[in-house]
């Protein structure tokens, strides 16, 4: 593995050369507290950005082991770190100038769901974060001075502010993991009680619009019919009450614009856990469930 200083020298040696000279940067580099891997280099500044990976060993990141000791906690932490890295790196996107996609810093988009993603992976050795960078050029002539800014100024700040425990608010991390553990408790209770779904009272089910998955402002909170109400004791939040849907055939009935489709869509998405503030944090559906549309001669 080469040292960061060697990368810096290589960058300066290829400045103003033809764009394909960037290909020689592919490889692994040791920075003071982390390792940088340039895994794929784009063919020209207008092509898809180059693929990079950063590895931070646990000895440097120093997140408590209890944050990632089991899969549930680990997925929650991975999701939180990826969102934080994406938020901070967005501030530096296109700060380096050039043609085409020069200066872009891009991370996989995180929606409202908490998912296991390859963009952030916690292993026994440490934290891996995968992202894309547009290597800068003027036309098709290398501008390695701008890439040097990205690799030696912007990225170290992104890593420091998002992947080191000392820089991530403790309370924020605790809340993410506690929510994930409470969601797991509800999933376990569904199986024990013979239920297929749970919708907590107070949940915000409507979305802002048809092309947005964000919660609608000033929406009417969900309230379960008394006949279907159940209470579940959670690990961190305490008891929570809402609607339990049993296995079998359930008919959603009501007048026009009364929220039938909204409830059905929330149940459909309930196979995934959602982030705090989404409104559907405690809308939980059996993770083996799937949605089928009605069609002529389809038998269900």
Please state what every model-predicted region is.
Residues 1-194, 205:
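N-terminal accessory targeting/assembly segments
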Residues 63-64, 139-142, 206-209, 253-255, ...:
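Short helix/loop capping segments that flank catalytic or ligand/cofactor-binding pockets
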Residues 80, 154, 263-270:
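Alpha-helical scaffold elements adjacent to nucleotide-binding pockets in ATP/GTP-utilizing enzyme cores
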Residues 110, 115, 181-184, 188, ...:
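Intrinsically disordered, low-complexity regulatory segments
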Residues 135, 200-202, 232-238, 249:
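Short, flexible loop/turn elements at secondary-structure junctions
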Residues 206-241, 284-300:
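N-terminal pre-Walker A segment at the start of P-loop NTPase domains
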Residues 240-268:
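Glycine-rich phosphate-binding P-loop
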């Amino acid at each position: 593995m080469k040292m960061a200083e060697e990368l810096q020298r290589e960058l300066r040696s290829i400045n103003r050369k033809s764009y394909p000279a960037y290909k020689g940067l592919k490889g692994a580099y040791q920075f003071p507290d982390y390792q940088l891997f340039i895994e794929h280099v784009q063919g020209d500044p207008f092509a898809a950005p180059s693929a990079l990976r950063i590895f931070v060993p646990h000895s440097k990141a120093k997140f408590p082991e209890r944050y990632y000791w089991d899969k549930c906690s680990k997925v929650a932490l991975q999701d939180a770190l990826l969102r934080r890295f994406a938020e901070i790196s967005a501030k530096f996107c296109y700060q380096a100038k050039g043609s085409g996609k020069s200066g872009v810093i891009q991370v996989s988009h995180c929606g409202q769901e908490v998912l296991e993603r390859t963009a952030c992976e916690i292993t026994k050795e440490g934290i891996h974060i995968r992202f894309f960078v547009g290597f800068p050029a003027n036309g098709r002539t290398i501008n390695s001075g701008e890439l040097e800014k990205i690799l030696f100024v912007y990225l170290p700040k992104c890593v420091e502010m998002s992947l080191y425990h000392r820089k991530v608010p403790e309370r924020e991390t605790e809340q993410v993991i506690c929510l994930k553990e409470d969601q797991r408790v509800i999933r376990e209770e569904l199986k024990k009680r013979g239920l297929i779904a749970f919708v907590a009272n107070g949940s915000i089910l409507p979305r802002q619009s048809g092309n947005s998955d964000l919660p609608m402002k000033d929406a009417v909170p969900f309230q379960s019919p008394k006949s279907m109400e159940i209470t579940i004791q959670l690990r961190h939040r305490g008891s929570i009450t809402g609607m339990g849907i049993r296995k079998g055939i359930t008919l959603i009935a009501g007048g026009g614009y009364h929220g039938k489709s909204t409830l059905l869509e929330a149940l459909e998405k309930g196979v995934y856990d959602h982030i705090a503030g989404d409104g559907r944090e405690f809308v939980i559906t059996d993770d083996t469930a799937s949605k089928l549309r009605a069609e002529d001669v389809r038998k269900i």
